[in-house]
């Protein structure tokens, strides 16, 4: 049996790409010979290092011919509907595209060849279904929760996310500004910003470094999966400002579509305090498995309350670890292969 995979964003090494390699792994485990379309085979090592997934059973080829000759084709959409030719065609939306003319007659004709449309969250599904007139299914991304363990905790606040300024910005500058206020009282804490710098960074990284001058802020560029796991294990709190300042109804693509890094942090007992928008609301139960915030001052005040309230950090950390287990890889493979 042969399976084909296409993702035009592979070299960005983000959450959607983590989803893609998990699909490849699931197909290999199901007995398929898997081909991923990409212009260079060197991407394989980069994907393995970033996501900690063995891709030894996966081939990288220049053209999967839109699934022609394959039993299964998994295609990550860039907003368009492709003409796919495999026996079974799966179309995946990792971005909530809107106002792209999704209901044209041509798209409706192309959709006849699609067996299943998969979204990464209910947030994405709601927008995709409305835009294209379809009924997609939600399969949450897989998270390597069994590989992520709590270690001896340090006074670290962590954020993991790309530094790219393309499409969806991660707002690391907002986190630095909030940390400056936080550190006036908590001088022994450190903010760590870790993420990929491969695509679309421009001069943003230098601006962040200048903004952080004089404060205990550490920036880690393109860490490996092993490094990220270590950071999760030692950090006490996870911050995110993705979606801040964005009108989610007008620009849903700019808020967090799911939030794999939040689940990874939770697996390590690192308490998330994340912006109240998009997929984050499906992951974090406010006050139970972390906190959601809307105004910048809430990010700081909720963090201070978490730290100062005796026993609260440990209590919520235990709940986050339990909550993260529903996103494990075994669950993903079962749902994907159904």
Labelled PLM ranges:
Residues 286-297, 305-311:
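Conserved acidic donor-binding segment of nucleotide-sugar-dependent glycosyltransferases
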Residues 233-257, 270:
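Acidic donor-binding loop of glycosyltransferase active sites
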Residues 115-147:
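Donor nucleotide-sugar binding/catalytic pocket of nucleotide-sugar-dependent glycosyltransferases
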Residues 205-230:
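Nucleotide-activated donor-binding/catalytic signature segment of Leloir-type glycosyltransferases, i.e.
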Residues 262-267, 271-274, 284:
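Short hydrophobic beta-strand element within catalytic cores of glycosyltransferases
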Residues 38-42, 190-206, 221:
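Glycosyltransferase donor-sugar binding loop
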Residues 294-298, 311-338:
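A charged, aromatic-enriched C-terminal amphipathic alpha-helix characteristic of glycosyltransferases
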Residues 118, 149-170, 176-183, 191-192:
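Conserved donor-binding/catalytic core segment of Leloir-type glycosyltransferases
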């Amino acid at each position: 049996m042969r399976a084909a995979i296409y993702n035009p964003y592979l070299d960005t090494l983000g959450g959607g790409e983590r989803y893609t390699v998990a699909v490849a792994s699931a197909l290999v485990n199901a007995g398929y010979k898997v081909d991923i379309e990409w212009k260079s085979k060197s991407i394989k090592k980069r994907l393995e290092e970033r996501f900690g997934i063995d891709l030894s059973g996966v081939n990288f080829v220049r053209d999967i011919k839109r699934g022609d000759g394959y039993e299964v084709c998994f295609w990550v959409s860039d907003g368009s509907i492709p003409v796919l030719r495999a026996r079974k065609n799966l179309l995946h939306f990792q971005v909530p595209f809107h106002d792209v003319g999704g209901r044209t007659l041509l798209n409706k004709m192309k959709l006849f060849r699609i067996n299943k449309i998969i979204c990464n969250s209910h947030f994405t599904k709601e927008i995709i279904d409305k835009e294209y007139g379809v009924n997609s299914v939600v399969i949450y991304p897989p998270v390597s929760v069994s590989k992520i363990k709590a270690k001896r905790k340090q006074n670290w606040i962590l954020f993991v996310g790309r530094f790219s300024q393309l499409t969806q910005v991660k707002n690391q500058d907002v986190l630095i500004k909030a940390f400056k206020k936080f550190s006036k009282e908590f001088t022994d804490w450190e903010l760590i910003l870790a993420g990929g710098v491969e695509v679309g960074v421009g001069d943003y990284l230098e601006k962040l470094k200048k903004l952080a001058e004089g404060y205990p802020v550490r920036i880690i560029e393109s860490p490996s999966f092993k490094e990220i796991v270590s950071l999760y294990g030692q950090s006490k709190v996870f911050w995110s400002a993705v979606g801040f300042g964005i009108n989610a109804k007008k620009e849903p693509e700019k808020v967090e579509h799911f939030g794999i890094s939040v689940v990874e942090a939770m697996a390590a007992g690192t308490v998330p305090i994340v912006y109240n928008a998009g997929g984050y609301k499906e992951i974090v139960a406010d006050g139970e498995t972390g906190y959601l915030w809307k105004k910048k001052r809430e990010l700081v005040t909720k963090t201070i309350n978490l730290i100062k309230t005796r026993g609260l950090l440990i209590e919520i950390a235990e709940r986050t670890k339990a909550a993260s287990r529903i996103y494990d890889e075994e669950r993903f493979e079962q749902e994907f292969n159904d």
